[in-house]
Amino acid sequence: MKLKMKAKTILLTGALSTVFAASAFAAPLHPVVHNDWMQQKKIINGFDQGGLLLERSVSLGEAVALIARGTGAEVAQPQGYWATNYLTWAYSKGAITKDEKANDRSFPAADRLTAIAKKLGLELQLPAGEQVTRGDFVQALGDALTEHVTIAHTNDVHGHIQENSKDKEFGYAKIATLVKEWREENKNFLLMDAGDTFQGTIYTNQFKGESILPILNSLGYGAMAAGNHEFDFGYEQLLKLRDQLKYPMINANVYKADGTNLLVPTYTTEVGGQKIAFIGFVTEETPIVTHPNNVIGLTFKDPVDIAKKLVPEMKEKADRVFILSHIGVEKDREIAKNVSGIDLIIGGHSHTPLRTPEVVNGTYIVQDWEYGKSLGRVDLYYYNKDLVGFSGGLVEYDESVKADPEIDKLVQEVVKKVDTAMGAVIGKTEVDLHGERGEVRAVETNLGNFIADAIIAKTKTIKGHEADVALVNGGGIRASKKAGDLTKKDLYSILPFPNTLTIVKATGADIKAALEVSVKGVEKKDDLPGSFLQIGGMSYVYDVTKPVGERVLEVKVGGQPIDPAKTYTVATNDFITSGGDGYSMLKKDEVLNTGYTFYDVVEEYLQNVKVINPKVENRIVEKK
């Protein structure tokens, strides 16, 4: 069968990578070696003495034969010398001269091979030189024979719109630069998002996600999957956001009360000669991790069950089926294991930096990281509509990437808009709130108690994850506040970090061990560590004169002595449950990351209660 070849026009000088020398971030992250699939397709054969001998120079006869096989030319099997019919075919096309036909064991230079290939229907990129190795020729031929599709992908950006060099986050302006480079490099390009985009920082939350619509609409996304946190402002607001996007928001496993899909379930596009269908999924735990009022009347079904039904249907309508999922890598693996026919799953939700793609049951699984710390890239190579090559990974934060001026302007407009909105009053405190460094890192404070209590109150709305205790690292509390009105800006100065509320199961022994870490440096008056914990739902007594690790004398949870063997539900933040500040005992395999920042939680609590008057209640007592 005759193939329609794509144009390849540049004869390179030096290595292939020099085409994109202007950027260190262009080109596939892991170049695909074409000789593997070309050998499987019997385009290239080994020698009798074994091996492909790719280091040898390619002869005229070999080059013509490889082109003929690769392009599907109708060349009769030779009866005598193996190259005769290939040479006759090339001569009939005007690609080689009569003298060349008679001297197939010559070794043409790169420019001559390029001219021959062009006459035979395709153009090659070859390193310039008097001779070309078999390896270089096969690689160039593979590039010309395949349709190369590049996909950039993001997930769980959570409103981190600005560059943050301290936490190594690109921000959208620098992501835009990478996207533009990749799009210019390969016309067969898609940018996709796997959800949790509109919620997470003050820059998104203050306007229920609408503030960043101009940024997203300027980046050129193809489609996005709805993440669980897209529901945090209520599903009606989700639909409002969807309607203002210039690209579709897809989901196939959320249903309205009348049995119809809440969102369009799929997105189909043609790129690189492939008709690709994307199916969107969100975690079925969404009704647990968002407020129940946000999803009233909605049903969240198991993505595996939906995939079993929908993938075969989409394969009838498209060449390839991809999944755009916000269900976490474990569930992605489950889909791949149980449903055949999926080329690629672009995932999110579990914040898993898949630097190396996974392969399960023939399905590639990728996931970008979180908060714009990286940009995912996938390169797929198709031959005769078969996937024959794959490369994937992450381009992680690099300060040297330049910010795109257009997107940077849009980002700064959002920042300015939010700064103006931060003057709004959200509550009132009848007492001074004590959050100075020397207090929150050394003793119980009324502000620490207020924050811990707000966190416990929030968990009471998350069915099955109601916390017994709350642990707040003092280093995360950054300011005090005089009695009076509390504005958004006041609260943000107290809780400026985007740490999110996490919930974990821990034994009484784990909790006591955490308290030992909390008080291990409490006597360091001039260098107090931020690991000191403000607490809720519990109390304890410690003795600073005791050795480190033996200072906690008495612990009570809910007024009762702690049971070392009992499992308790602990609410804290993602920094602590990742083992930060030495809290390795709280780094568990199963952690619920709610996605709510401490700022979000405390603001909501304050808006509900309106007036606060927190006190010190002997939750933390030093034995004198």
Can you name each region flagged by the protein language model?
Residues 66, 115, 140, 178, ...:
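Generic alpha-helical secondary-structure signal
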